[in-house]
């Protein structure tokens, strides 16, 4: 070991640039290549990773291993370069027992409440930072268009503007408002914008498949949210798994160099996703060996290489054989060291803080925030007047369904025992989670009986016939197959329903059907769930007692006829008369059961709105609202193209009336002359019901005639507006003319002169929007 105490790179009074230059000059090639590697700590052999491989970063580090890793750096390495420790803290610190698990990212988007999303990011950072983890691989900025894709739950939905608003907010929360290059407070963590870019544009929903994306399509929809957080200072970017135009994103010069580093002047750190470099050799087969893969990855601008152990030998060979100039290694390592100096890790490795762990993780304040977000993350999509339900002594509530009392499935993916780590086999503490059954038992008044029946199973697990391990050595999970029908479970649920005044049926999906490698060919409910719903709907028709269906799932699913009517060219809605109300709760987190029970019992007003469109049938996909204008006809020969529920939809327990929109600042000339101008639109909004409620007023812009094909309308602003019964407010929106853009055939974003529509209202559906126009010269 060398005494490094007096060396310049150890001197906190020197500028970071001088410290980096000094340290870089002392490092061997092996040490520099090691700094570019982030490896999986679950192997347990920390000495091999840190001492032999010289790794600069680790992930998936258990609570027991984290302090030991830091000690190994300090006592067994030559230069004592601190580790940067990352983990998947996707909607809370997923893999720390007792941490606050919020609704999924898609659930948070359902709130249409950026302030709450920022608060969730802040709370997550406060908890994560106590544990010695410095960096979360969040948020996901992918656009969810094909809902068969397994990672829809990790997104903020289908609209680029909404994604940008939510991503910007959560990044500010994680980083405590710090921008790229600025020091991070003790209770802040680095954010990571992923998966750059176009990863979600799959073939048939299949995860990590080739993305059929032109530069124009990328510029039009997929890049704007990333551009926003890049310019606002998101500390790191993660690169997607997929290929575009035959080039894996990891090696895509146009995206990494021309756009991100070039046009956007991004100075942060780039990290590959899991084994991207290795996959180019063993799966995509676009690189002959690890030396060529490592050389091309570094040349493309990658800094940290996630979980590709052979990058170490490959990069060293590439330098020594002339495939790669060592100066490019130096540039990448300089950016990694800058990140570590920014975090102050050389002076304070940010070890786990036991006192803060006790007081911050799962704190009362964070649990209250979690409940507030859960309340806003539920979208009521159908209600014939049965809700809110008045529970009282002598009444009976049947709570049925396989997810009504499943605490861990309620949390969704990236939460304890969802499959990513091995130290939480039981998941998050049961006592911290309020299931829907728990919620009704807590809230039902004395003398009101709450009775549970499972009703159906969702999946059975079987061995994967392709073997126990993937080609990269990771264990293959068991396969999920649709569960066999269980008549006894169904009979018990039907009997429970017949004896009750209200039936709440909770259905959805499970983590084995969600996530990486877990895309689905269909969107139907699996197992005996549809049979259960149809049987319960028959009971509701016979007894006249209300049936409420709660879909608790990772993504929109195709609901049976008893919920949405019988599909066809013309939908037969008469078959949906057995279900009185339908609501969606996208993995609502630890407090989701309480929030849902509060909504059904009328203690909380539903205010969630859909961040993503619900199809009637998987064959309708894609159904996102902002599709390009122009096709022959507006329906299939055998099925409507109208979705079950559209982007922006959601009901409350009161009603709202919109006035006519006006542009209040039209110039004397009648036209807005420059892109520096701002259009101010106003509309009156009145609560015409008898309850206090919250409306999400949405503003869409449509360019009426465009030189290049474009969508009919795009979300450009929204506001949550709370109104007392009978109250009227004037809601104002400021829309910069510079935001009223299209993208031309050369992939340039432009504002064209001409007439524009301003559409304001309740949802993305034309029938829900009030219209006015303005003109740009």
Residue ranges of model-derived segments:
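Glycoside hydrolase catalytic-domain context in secreted enzymes
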Residues: 1-744, 752-766, 773-777
């Amino acid at each position: 070991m060398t005494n490094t105490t007096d060396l310049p790179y150890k001197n906190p009074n020197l500028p970071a640039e001088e410290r980096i230059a000094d340290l870089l000059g002392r490092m061997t090639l092996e040490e520099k290549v090691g700094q570019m590697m982030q490896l999986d700590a679950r192997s347990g052999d920390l000495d091999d990773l840190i001492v032999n491989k010289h790794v600069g970063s680790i992930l998936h580090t258990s609570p027991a291993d984290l302090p030991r890793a830091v000690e190994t750096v300090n006592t067994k390495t030559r230069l004592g370069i601190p580790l940067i420790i990352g983990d998947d803290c996707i909607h809370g610190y997923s893999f720390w027992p007792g941490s606050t698990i919020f609704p999924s990212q898609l659930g948070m988007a359902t709130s249409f409440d950026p302030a709450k999303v920022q608060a969730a990011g802040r709370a997550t950072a406060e908890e994560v930072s106590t544990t010695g983890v410095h960096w979360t691989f969040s948020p996901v900025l992918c656009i969810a268009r094909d809902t068969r894709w397994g990672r829809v739950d990790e997104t903020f939905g289908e609209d680029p503007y909404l994604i940008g608003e939510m991503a910007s907010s959560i990044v500010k929360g994680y980083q405590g408002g710090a921008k790229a290059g600025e020091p991070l407070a003790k209770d802040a963590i680095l954010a990571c914008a992923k998966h750059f870019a176009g990863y979600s544009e799959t073939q048939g929903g299949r995860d990590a498949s080739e993305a059929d994306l032109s530069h124009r399509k990328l510029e039009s929809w997929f890049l704007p949210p990333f551009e926003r957080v890049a310019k606002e200072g998101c500390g790191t970017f993660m690169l997607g798994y997929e290929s575009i135009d035959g080039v894996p994103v990891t090696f895509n010069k146009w995206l990494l160099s021309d756009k991100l580093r070039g046009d956007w002047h991004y100075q942060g750190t780039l990290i590959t996703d899991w084994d991207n470099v290795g996959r180019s050799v063993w799966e995509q087969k676009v690189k002959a060996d690890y030396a060529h893969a490592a050389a091309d990855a570094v040349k493309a601008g990658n800094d940290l290489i996630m979980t590709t152990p052979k990058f170490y030998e490959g990069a060293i060979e590439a330098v020594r054989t002339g495939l790669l100039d060592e100066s490019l290694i130096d540039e990448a390592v300089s950016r990694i060291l800058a990140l570590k100096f920014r975090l102050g890790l050389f002076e304070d490795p940010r070890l786990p803080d036991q006192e803060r762990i006790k007081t911050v993780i799962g704190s009362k304040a964070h649990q209250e925030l979690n409940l507030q977000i859960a309340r806003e993350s539920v979208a009521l999509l159908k209600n014939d007047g049965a809700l809110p339900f008045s529970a009282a002594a002598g009444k009976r509530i049947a709570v049925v369904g396989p997810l009504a009392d499943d605490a861990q499935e309620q949390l969704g993916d990236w939460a304890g025992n969802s499959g990513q780590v091995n130290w939480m086999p039981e998941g998050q503490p049961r006592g911290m989670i309020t299931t829907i059954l728990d919620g009704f038992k807590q809230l039902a008044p004395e003398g009101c009986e709450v009775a549970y029946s499972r009703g159906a199973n969702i999946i059975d697990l079987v061995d994967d016939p392709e073997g126990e391990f993937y080609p990269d050595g990771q264990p293959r999970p068991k396969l999920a197959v649709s569960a066999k029908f269980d008549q006894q479970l169904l009979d018990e649920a039907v009997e429970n329903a017949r004896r009750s005044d209200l039936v709440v049926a909770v259905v959805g999906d499970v983590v084995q059907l969600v996530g990486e490698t877990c895309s689905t060919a269909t969107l139907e409910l699996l197992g005996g769930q549809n049979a259960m719903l149809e049987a319960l709907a028959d009971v509701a028709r016979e007894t006249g007692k209300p049936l409420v269906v709660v879909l608790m799932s990772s993504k929109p699913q195709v609901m049976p006829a008893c919920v949405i009517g019988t599909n066809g060219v013309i939908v037969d809605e008469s078959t949906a008369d057995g279900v009185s109300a339908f609501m969606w709760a996208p993995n609502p987190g630890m407090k989701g059961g309480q929030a849902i029970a509060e909504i059904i019992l009328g203690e909380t007003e539903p205010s969630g709105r859909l961040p993503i469109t619900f199809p009637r049938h998987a064959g309708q996909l894609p159904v996102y609202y902002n599709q390009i204008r122009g096709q022959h006809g507006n329906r299939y020969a055998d099925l409507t193209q109208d979705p079950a529920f559209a982007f922006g939809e959601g009901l409350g327990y009161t009603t709202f009336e919109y006035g006519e929109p006006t542009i209040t600042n039209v110039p004397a000339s009648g036209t807005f002359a420059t892109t520096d101008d701002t259009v101010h639109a106003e509309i009156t909004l009145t609560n015409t019901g008898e309850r206090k409620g919250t409306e999400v007023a949405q503003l869409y812009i449509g360019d009426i005639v465009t030189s290049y094909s474009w969508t009919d309308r795009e979300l450009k602003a929204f506001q949550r507006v709370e109104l007392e019964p009978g109250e009227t407010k004037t809601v104002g929106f400021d829309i910069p003319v510079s935001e009223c853009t299209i993208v031309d055939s050369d992939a340039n974003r432009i504002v064209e002169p001409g007439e524009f529509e301003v559409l304001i209202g309740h949802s993305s559906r034309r029938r829900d929007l009030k219209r006015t126009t303005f003109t740009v010269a």
